[in-house]
Amino acid sequence: MAVQKSKKSRARRGMRRSHDAISGPSLTVDQTSGETHRRHHVTADGYYKGVQVISK
């Protein structure tokens, strides 16, 4: 089992964790309907990059 040589300080722990924050989903506005949706995902009405890919 690995055992550390010396205790890591709170500052070092914080520096290691500085990149662990979760960012929110990236959103974009659809060209045709103006609807907000997640990037690289089909909108609720079936459009992707301004083209209808799913018909309802």
From Swiss-Prot:
Pfam families: Ribosomal_L32p. InterPro entries: Ribosomal_bL32, Ribosomal_bL32_bact, Ribosomal_zn-bd. Residues 1-16 have a biased composition (Basic residues). GO terms for cellular component: large ribosomal subunit. Transmembrane segments: none annotated. The keyword Repeat does not apply. GO terms for molecular function: structural constituent of ribosome. Disulfide bonds: none annotated. Residues 1-56 are annotated as: Disordered. Residues 25-34 have a biased composition (Polar residues). GO terms for biological process: translation. Keywords: Ribonucleoprotein, Ribosomal protein. NCBIfam families: rpmF_bact. Belongs to the bacterial ribosomal protein bL32 family. HAMAP family: Ribosomal_bL32. This is Large ribosomal subunit protein bL32. It comes from Pseudoalteromonas translucida (strain TAC 125).
